[in-house]
């Protein structure tokens, strides 16, 4: 089918008319005849979109309507027509998830979720500039739904290498301090308003943390054959197994100290062994060595150089790629992928 070149102002007028009928008149008290005419016109919009599909385009080849049924007006629950897709969004189907199973798998990694108001660029004359959306932040992406009960994300974007920051100037009302924006690597801008300034700051901090976490998993390339051999030798290190051994050792020591008679048995087996009161117990499985130089940009991170011996105090943030370590009396978080076990046990 030959494509149709539709002027941009005509497309804008059509979108405004459809939005006015669908949104502005949805909750108005209309007569039975008026509501019937409204539904007939909306149905005609859907028929035109289905008939011309992606070939119903603007001059220059920019698609004005698609048959996907997802757009800035995707929260209008009217089955008689299919809305258009706005040009300011990244399609989840094309850029992030490819099937329902991938969506379900990603939702198992939810980091933060809640209602936000998303700013629309092409909201038209009658449409609202801000849309309320149920937003979900996972370890890899930012997804948003038409409501909390939505099963399929309407749109979203990958957070890798994105920039999140507070942006108070985008609103002039009392909620200006609750605004923030996210800029993706391809310079797409997504602007949101949270319920409160503290909630907005929390969204920004969580996104920044996840972006930093994705960057920390990238192993820098070094043109050094010796370094390559060192990395090769550490790939098979049983880190998880040694962690379990360390925890088991702690439990065994607790039992050893609490059960009477074990000390006598131990002394009978080894007469030369004498345990001094207050002697600290060293778990060599908690000591790691730096694989590369790591210079921190934040006060909560620990800087170290290759070969430094770091005492790991906690692996609480293991799922995010960070541990809590100590070096020369200084405590901070360290990227776990930059470390290798210091002792062979």
UniProtKB/Swiss-Prot annotation:
Region (Disordered): 226-274
Assembly and oligomerization: Homodimer.
Record localization: Cytoplasm; Nucleus; Cell membrane
PANTHER family per record: SRC KINASE-ASSOCIATED PHOSPHOPROTEIN 1 (PTHR15129:SF1), SRC-ASSOCIATED ADAPTOR PROTEIN (PTHR15129)
Name assigned to this protein: Src kinase-associated phosphoprotein 1
Annotated function: Positively regulates T-cell receptor signaling. Required for optimal conjugation between T-cells and antigen-presenting cells.
Naturally occurring in which organism (per UniProt): Xenopus tropicalis
Post-translational modification: Phosphorylated on tyrosines.
Keyword annotations: Adaptive immunity, Cell membrane, Cytoplasm, Immunity, Membrane, Nucleus, Phosphoprotein, SH3 domain
Pfam families membership: PH, SH3_1
Family to which the UniProt record says this protein belongs: Belongs to the SKAP family.
A biological process from GO: adaptive immune response
SH3 domain location: 283-344
GO cellular component: cytoplasm; nucleus; plasma membrane
CDD domains: PH_Skap1 (cd13380)
InterPro entries cross-referenced by the UniProt entry: PH-like_dom_sf, PH_domain, SH3-like_dom_sf, SH3_domain, SKAP_fam
Extent of Acidic residues compositional bias: 250-272
SUPFAM superfamilies membership: PH domain-like (SSF50729), SH3-domain (SSF50044)
PH domain location: 109-212
Coiled-coil features, chain-numbered ranges: none
């Amino acid at each position: 089918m030959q494509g149709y070149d539709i002027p941009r102002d005509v497309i804008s007028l059509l979108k405004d008319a459809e939005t006015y009928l669908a949104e502005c008149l949805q909750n108005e008290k209309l007569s039975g005849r008026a509501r019937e005419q409204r539904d007939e016109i909306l149905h005609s919009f859907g028929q035109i979109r289905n008939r011309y599909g992606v070939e119903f385009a603007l001059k220059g080849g920019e698609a004005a309507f698609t048959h996907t049924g997802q757009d800035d007006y995707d929260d209008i629950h009217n089955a008689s027509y299919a809305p258009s897709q706005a040009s300011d969004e990244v399609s989840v189907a094309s850029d992030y998830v490819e099937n329902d199973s991938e969506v379900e798998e990603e939702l198992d990694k939810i980091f933060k979720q809640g209602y936000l108001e998303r700013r629309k660029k092409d909201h038209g004359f009658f449409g609202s500039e801000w849309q309320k959306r149920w937003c979900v932040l996972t370890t890899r992406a930012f997804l948003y739904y038409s409501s909390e009960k939505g099963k399929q994300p309407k749109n979203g974007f990958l957070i890798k290498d994105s920039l999140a920051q507070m942006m108070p100037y985008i609103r002039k009302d009392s909620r200006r301090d609750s605004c923030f924006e996210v800029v993706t690597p391809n310079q797409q801008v997504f602007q949101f308003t949270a319920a409160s300034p503290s909630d907005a700051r929390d969204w920004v901090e969580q996104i920044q943390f996840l972006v930093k976490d994705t960057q920390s998993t990238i192993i820098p390339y070094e043109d050094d054959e010796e370094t390559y051999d060192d990395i090769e030798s550490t790939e098979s290190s049983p880190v998880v197994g040694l962690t379990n051994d360390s925890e088991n050792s702690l439990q065994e020591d607790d039992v050893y100290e609490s059960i009477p008679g074990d000390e006598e048995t131990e002394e009978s087996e080894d007469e030369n062994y004498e345990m001094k009161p207050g002697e600290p117990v060293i778990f060599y499985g908690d000591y790691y060595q730096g694989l590369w130089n790591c210079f921190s940009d934040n006060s909560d991170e620990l800087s170290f150089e290759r070969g430094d011996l770091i005492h790991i105090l906690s692996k609480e943030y293991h799922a995010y790629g960070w541990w809590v370590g100590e070096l020369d009396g200084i405590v901070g978080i360290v990227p776990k992928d930059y470390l290798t076990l210091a002792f062979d046990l």
